[in-house]
Amino acid sequence: MAVANSSPVNPVVFFDVSIGGQEVGRMKIELFADVVPKTAENFRQFCTGEFRKDGVPIGYKGSTFHRVIKDFMIQGGDFVNGDGTGVASIYRGPFADENFKLRHSAPGLLSMANSGPSTNGCQFFITCSKCDWLDGKHVVFGKIIDGLLVMRKIEFQAPLGKRVQAWTHSLTCPALTGILALILMPTE
């Protein structure tokens, strides 16, 4: 399946984004709970802070976008180590690839970052273009439904092939679930 059709039962999360201290907008993301419920729920709970470890909420608040590659993807969600090596999930460790029904067929798709089969955790990426070579390797579990231009603003912070580091900070989330703000700084 190329891209799942929107469903009114699917949760929507959002990222409020700022670059260099300037607010650039909001990305609303529908999570495909109707196709990949386990994967969508893992992400949703890390967005809302519902998941707790030793009574303390853990999730994307304060995490980084550690990879931004123009014409490919923006990757983040490693709130464990902040560098792309951390793994955590609401299931207490890496979890299996739920299914590969959805394809990396367009920009704006949310997919699990992993280090091989069935190593899903907290890390995710958003496609900046069609990435069909990732099909069957990474689980697509959401799509930007509003704010694709904001994703492009993040993407264009990275010179070709270079990484951009981004710190995320919590903002209030009035009606939807989930929050992130980005402050991008080039790294070498």
UniProtKB/Swiss-Prot annotation:
Q: What are the record's GO terms for cellular component?
A: cytoplasm; nuclear speck; spliceosomal complex
Question: Which gene name does the record give?
Answer: Ppih
> What protein name does the entry list?
Peptidyl-prolyl cis-trans isomerase H
* Substrates-to-products reaction catalysed: [protein]-peptidylproline (omega=180) = [protein]-peptidylproline (omega=0)
Outline what the protein does: PPIase that catalyzes the cis-trans isomerization of proline imidic peptide bonds in oligopeptides and may therefore assist protein folding. Participates in pre-mRNA splicing. May play a role in the assembly of the U4/U5/U6 tri-snRNP complex, one of the building blocks of the spliceosome. May act as a chaperone.
Q: Which InterPro entries match?
A: Cyclophilin-like_dom_sf, Cyclophilin-type_PPIase_CS, Cyclophilin-type_PPIase_dom
- How does this polypeptide assemble, per the annotation? Interacts directly with PRPF4. Part of a heteromeric complex containing PPIH, PRPF3 and PRPF4 that is stable in the absence of RNA. Component of the U4/U6-U5 tri-snRNP complex composed of the U4, U6 and U5 snRNAs and at least PRPF3, PRPF4, PRPF6, PRPF8, PRPF31, SNRNP200, TXNL4A, SNRNP40, DDX23, CD2BP2, PPIH, SNU13, EFTUD2, SART1 and USP39. Heterodimer with PRPF18. Heterodimer with PRPF18.
Instruction: State the organism of origin.
Output: Mus musculus
| Protein EC | 5.2.1.8
Which Pfam family is one of this chain's hits?
Pro_isomerase
